[in-house]
UniProtKB/Swiss-Prot annotation:
Residues flagged as site, Activates thiol group during catalysis: H156
Active site positions: C129 (nucleophile)
Protein name, per record: Glyceraldehyde-3-phosphate dehydrogenase
Record's keyword terms, sorted: Cytoplasm, Glycolysis, NAD, Oxidoreductase
Protein's cellular compartments: Cytoplasm
Main location: cytoplasm
Pathway: Carbohydrate degradation; glycolysis; pyruvate from D-glyceraldehyde 3-phosphate: step 1/5
C-alpha cells in the first residue's frame, strides 16, 4: 500500500468483509491503522482505494483476471509447489510469487540472485523470511572473504502455527509446547536454502531455530569460518559499504545499541548489527543480523 503497486484483489475463504476491516484496523504488533478502511459496494476500501475480495478455497476458482490482478502473492503456505501454485494462472494471473520456500519453484532473494531471473518463469519462490535475512549476510561475507563453512541459529518470533498452551503435536513434540513461556528448539531449512540462491555455498551452511515468546522481529546468528583472514573491523566495513552500495535497501548497517522491537516495521531484509558480532580469530567469526 505504500509502494507504486496497486493492490486490486484479495482471496480469503475464512473471513468476511467486516472482519477484514477489523483485522486491518487493529493490530497487536503494529497498532491501529492510521488511514481509512471500510466496506462499500461489496469491496474492501483502504485509503479510498477499492480492493475486490474473493472467498475461494481452491485457487483454480479465483477469477483474478476479472479484478485486473496480474501478479499474485501465494501466502497460504499450502500451495507451495509449482504445480499447486500454477492453479492461480487459470483465473487470469500472469505471475505467481510464493512467499515461502518451494520444493521445485525457482527461488529468488532480493539483492542476492535476482540477476538469474528469467521472464519466462511464471511461478517463483521468494524463500522464507529467515533466508531473506541470512542470504544477503552470507553473500557479503562470501563475496569479500569466502566462506569455508558455517552454522546458523535463528532466534525466531512466535508464528501462527504455535500453541498458546501445551497441546498435541505428533510430528513435532516440542512444537506442541506453549509458546508463551518457553524457548522451543525447532528445525529450519533456511541455511540450506541459501545454497539454492548462492550455489557456491551449497552444502556449506546448515542451521536450527529457537522459537521464543516475542511477537515480531527475529535474529540470525551466523558463525562462519572464512577463507581470507580479516579483522572484525574489515568485516564491518564490508557490510557498511554493501549497505550504501549494491545492497542498499536490502542490508542496513547499525552501530547503535538497539533491541528487537526497534526494528518492527523495518523494510530492510537484513540489518547487520555491528556491535553484536564477535570474533575468535582472523578466520572465525560470529555475525548478527
Amino acid at each position: 500500500l505504500e509502494t507504486d503497486l496497486d493492490v486490486v484483489a484479495i482471496n480469503d475463504p475464512f473471513i468476511d468483509l467486516a472482519y477484514m476491516v477489523y483485522m486491518f484496523k487493529y493490530d497487536s504488533v503494529h497498532g491501529r491503522f492510521s488511514g481509512s478502511v471500510e466496506t462499500k459496494d461489496g469491496k474492501l476500501w483502504i485509503n479510498q482505494k477499492p480492493i475486490t475480495v474473493f472467498r475461494k478455497r481452491d485457487p483454480v476458482q479465483i477469477p483474478w483476471g476479472s479484478a485486473g490482478a496480474e501478479y499474485i502473492v501465494e501466502s497460504t503456505g499450502v500451495f507451495t509447489t509449482t504445480e499447486k501454485a500454477s492453479a492461480h494462472l487459470k483465473g487470469g494471473a500472469k505471475k505467481i510469487v510464493i512467499s515461502a520456500p518451494s520444493a521445485d519453484a525457482p527461488m529468488f532473494v532480493c539483492g542476492v540472485n535476482l540477476d538469474k531471473y528469467d521472464p519466462k518463469f511464471q511461478v517463483v519462490s521468494n524463500a522464507s523470511c529467515t533466508t531473506n535475512c541470512l542470504a544477503p549476510l552470507a553473500k557479503v561475507v562470501n563475496d569479500k572473504f569466502g566462506i569455508v563453512e558455517g552454522l546458523m541459529t535463528t532466534v525466531h518470533a512466535t508464528t501462527a502455527t504455535q500453541k498458546t498452551v501445551d497441546g498435541p503435536s505428533a510430528k513435532d513434540w516440542r512444537g506442541g509446547r506453549s509458546v508463551n513461556n518457553n524457548i522451543i528448539p525447532s528445525s529450519t531449512g533456511a541455511a540450506k536454502a541459501v545454497g539454492k540462491v548462492i550455489p557456491e555455498l551449497n552444502g556449506k551452511l546448515t542451521g536450527l531455530s529457537f522459537r521464543v515468546p516475542t511477537l515480531d522481529v527475529s535474529v540470525v546468528d551466523l558463525v562462519v569460518r572464512i577463507e581470507q583472514s580479516a579483522t572484525y573491523d574489515e568485516i564491518k566495513e564490508a557490510f557498511r559499504e554493501a549497505s550504501k552500495g549494491s545492497l542498499k535497501g536490502i542490508i542496513e548497517y547499525t552501530d547503535e545499541h538497539v533491541v528487537s522491537t526497534d526494528f518492527i516495521g523495518h523494510t530492510a531484509s537484513s540489518i547487520f548489527d555491528s556491535l553484536a558480532g564477535i570474533q575468535l580469530n582472523a578466520n572465525f567469526v560470529k555475525l548478527i543480523a
